[in-house]
Structures are given as structure tokens and as C-alpha cells.
């Protein structure tokens, strides 16, 4: 029997998750909830500037959509607690609105009858933060609300874990060179949150910004909690980002080849490895949560310490979405 999924919030991540789930056996989206009208949602599902056209058939019908012959109910309910998740026997809600980002708020989906909630954002408070294939084995099935972290944390975590496990990570700094997103202005204008830099034209500027990924990594890999800090530079590309991580290692005399070899050995469906001289457009649509770029590894001895700089690519849309769907499937499987 298929795992029944509802998507709350049919924006960039919600729609791409819908697409991704179509290719995953055993998962079925049965409902979406978004305040936008169905005709617009169907259009944006079918056509996507960065990820390309959806290959399936999409039709608006009364009360929802028909996608590849399957009916999907659509709601425009602003209060998650009033959604009919119990009547629809929803196994997992993929929470993509950005509003239900702590356990107390996400509990509204549980109260409405859903069995589990996966938040597509960093969560506040006592919520397990999962990066699939880094710490998903910490889930035991008892959790009702789980966070899928952020796209940047998903790119950072496997790299940081390898450095910590193999060479000892003392401390470090990360920078994400990040595509612009919907929380930036396309023309110079007052920003809704009063941010003077995000008020500037996203496609024309390199815009310094903050990131919580360095702090959040401690929720994923407790042994490096507090050892990293970081920032972001938003750049004029619509998707396709890069995380640079520079750390002091505990182990001495580490070489570039040793670092790259350790990363290659750790590669899996979530963590890719490449020695090709790629650029950001090459990784758009990629389903690795993080793609280690061996061509950018550098090492330096500073006093009696070893300094290493590494880099990993990620599609801040599809890479993250693929990781979310992996976590969603695992979370639901544990509940069977």
C-alpha cells in the first residue's frame, strides 16, 4: 500500500517535491494545500524556468487536479488544524509553507489527523534535524515532527562529517555562494523584512547574507556542535550553489589526495563526487544533496596545524528536494 502524502505549501519546494515523488515507488501525493488558485498552481507545476517542463499530464478538475490520471485534492485552508488529514488517512505531511517551523505549530497537522510531519526548513526547538545518509539512522519511528534542515546544511553535512571522522575537525568557517531566492527583490525597493541588502536587485548584485547552516550542523553532527561559523554571498544565478568549507584539522600532514580519497569513499546517492571542471549550470536538476568537487581541495600547514579548504556543489532547489523525499520515505517506512 502506498504511503499517502499531503503537501502544505505548493511553492518552489512543494512543487518540486511533487515532481520528485512521482518517480518514487510507494509514495503517493493525495492532497495539496495552498492559498493560490488551482489554475495558477497547475500552470506553475507544468512549467518551470529552471527545472524544465513537467513531463506528466496536469489537468484542473473540480476540487483539485488530475495528474497522470490520478486525482489529487486541493485545499486553500490557512489554518492547518482545519485540514481533513484524518479523513484522507495522511501518513506524512510535507510542510513547505515556512510558517509551521517548530514542533508546537507543526502539531496542528497531527491534530488534524496526519501521522507525521516533515518540515522543509530548519526547525526551532526540540525537533530532530535530518540530513539523509548523514544522520537519518537516528530516527526510530517514534517522532511525529522532523526537520529536513536547509539546502545548505544538506550540502555541508556530509563534507563536514568526513573531515571530522577521518581527520579530526577542530574549528572552521563555511561560506555558501548561493543563488538568489524569492526572499530577495528583483528591483531595488524596500524589503519586506527591512533588509537593506536584500532590498537590492538580486540578478544584478553579489549580496552578502547570513546563513544558519554552520550553527544548525550541530543538530545533525553533535560532535562538531559549536565548531563552525559561516556566512553567505547571494549571487546572480537563479539556482545552483556552492558551499566552501575551510577548517583546521587535528591530524597533521594531511594531503589533498587523502582528503579527496576520503570523500570519494564516502560518496553515495546523497553525496556525490566529481573531478570534472564543472560550473553551476551543470548541477541544475541534480539529485545529490551535495556534490564534492575534488578539483577545489587545498591544504596548507599553519604552525603546527593543518588547514584544509574544500567545496561542494548543490542545486538549492532540486538537491534539497531529493533529500527531503528520501527522508520522507524513510520516515514513513519506520511507521509501518
From Swiss-Prot:
GO biological process, one term: glycolytic process
Site residues, Activates thiol group during catalysis: 178
Catalyzed reactions per annotation: D-glyceraldehyde 3-phosphate + phosphate + NAD(+) = (2R)-3-phospho-glyceroyl phosphate + NADH + H(+)
Gene Ontology cellular component terms for the protein in this record: cytoplasm
EC number(s) from the headed UniProt entry: 1.2.1.12
Name of a matching Pfam family: Gp_dh_N
Subcellular location: Cytoplasm
GO MF assignments: glyceraldehyde-3-phosphate dehydrogenase (NAD+) (phosphorylating) activity; NAD binding; NADP binding
Annotated keywords: Cytoplasm, Glycolysis, NAD, Nucleotide-binding, Oxidoreductase
Stored PROSITE patterns: GAPDH
Residues reported to bind D-glyceraldehyde 3-phosphate: 150-152, 181, 198, 211-212, 234
Record pathway: Carbohydrate degradation; glycolysis; pyruvate from D-glyceraldehyde 3-phosphate: step 1/5
InterPro entries from the UniProt entry: GlycerAld/Erythrose_P_DH, GlycerAld_3-P_DH_AS, GlycerAld_3-P_DH_cat, GlycerAld_3-P_DH_NAD(P)-bd, Glyceraldehyde-3-P_DH_1, NAD(P)-bd_dom_sf
Active site positions, chain numbering: 151
Family from the record: Belongs to the glyceraldehyde-3-phosphate dehydrogenase family.
Task performed by this protein: Catalyzes the oxidative phosphorylation of glyceraldehyde 3-phosphate (G3P) to 1,3-bisphosphoglycerate (BPG) using the cofactor NAD. The first reaction step involves the formation of a hemiacetal intermediate between G3P and a cysteine residue, and this hemiacetal intermediate is then oxidized to a thioester, with concomitant reduction of NAD to NADH. The reduced NADH is then exchanged with the second NAD, and the thioester is attacked by a nucleophilic inorganic phosphate to produce BPG.
Assembly, per entry: Homotetramer.
Protein name according to UniProt: Glyceraldehyde-3-phosphate dehydrogenase 1
Amino acid at each position: 500500500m502506498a504511503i499517502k502524502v499531503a503537501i502544505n505549501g505548493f511553492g518552489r519546494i512543494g512543487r518540486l517535491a511533487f515532481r520528485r515523488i512521482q518517480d518514487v515507488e510507494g509514495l503517493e501525493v493525495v492532497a495539496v494545500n495552498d492559498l493560490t488558485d488551482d489554475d495558477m498552481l497547475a500552470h506553475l507545476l507544468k512549467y518551470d524556468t529552471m527545472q524544465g517542463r513537467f513531463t506528466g499530464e496536469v489537468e484542473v478538475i473540480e476540487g483539485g487536479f488530475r495528474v497522470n490520471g490520478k486525482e489529487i485534492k486541493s485545499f486553500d485552508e490557512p489554518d492547518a488544524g482545519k485540514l481533513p488529514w484524518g479523513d484522507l488517512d495522511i501518513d506524512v505531511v510535507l510542510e513547505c509553507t515556512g510558517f509551521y517551523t517548530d514542533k508546537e505549530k507543526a502539531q496542528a497537522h497531527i491534530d488534524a489527523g496526519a501521522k507525521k510531519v516533515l518540515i522543509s526548513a530548519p526547525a526551532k526547538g526540540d525537533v530532530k534535524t535530518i540530513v539523509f545518509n548523514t544522520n537519518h539512522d537516528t530516527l526510530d519511528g517514534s517522532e511525529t515532527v522532523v526537520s529536513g534542515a536547509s539546502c545548505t546544511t544538506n550540502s555541508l553535512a556530509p563534507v563536514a562529517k568526513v573531515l571530522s571522522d577521518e581527520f579530526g575537525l577542530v574549528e572552521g568557517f563555511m561560506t555558501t555562494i548561493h543563488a538568489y531566492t524569492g526572499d530577495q527583490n528583483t528591483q531595488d525597493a524596500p524589503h519586506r523584512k527591512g533588509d537593506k541588502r536584500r532590498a537590492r536587485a538580486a540578478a544584478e548584485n553579489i549580496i552578502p547574507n547570513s546563513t544558519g547552516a554552520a550553527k544548525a550542523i550541530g543538530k545533525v553532527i553533535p560532535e562538531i556542535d559549536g565548531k563552525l561559523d559561516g556566512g553567505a554571498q547571494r549571487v546572480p544565478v537563479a539556482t545552483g550553489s556552492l558551499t566552501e568549507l575551510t577548517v583546521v584539522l587535528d591530524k597533521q600532514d594531511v594531503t589533498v589526495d587523502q582528503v579527496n580519497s576520503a570523500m570519494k569513499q564516502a560518496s553515495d546517492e546523497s553525496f556525490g563526487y566529481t573531478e570534472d571542471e564543472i560550473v553551476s549550470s551543470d548541477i541544475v536538476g541534480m539529485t545529490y544533496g551535495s556534490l564534492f568537487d575534488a578539483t577545489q581541495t587545498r591544504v596548507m600547514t599553519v604552525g603546527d596545524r593543518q588547514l584544509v579548504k574544500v567545496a561542494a556543489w548543490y542545486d538549492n532547489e532540486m538537491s534539497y528536494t531529493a533529500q527531503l523525499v528520501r527522508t520522507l520515505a524513510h520516515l514513513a517506512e519506520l511507521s509501518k
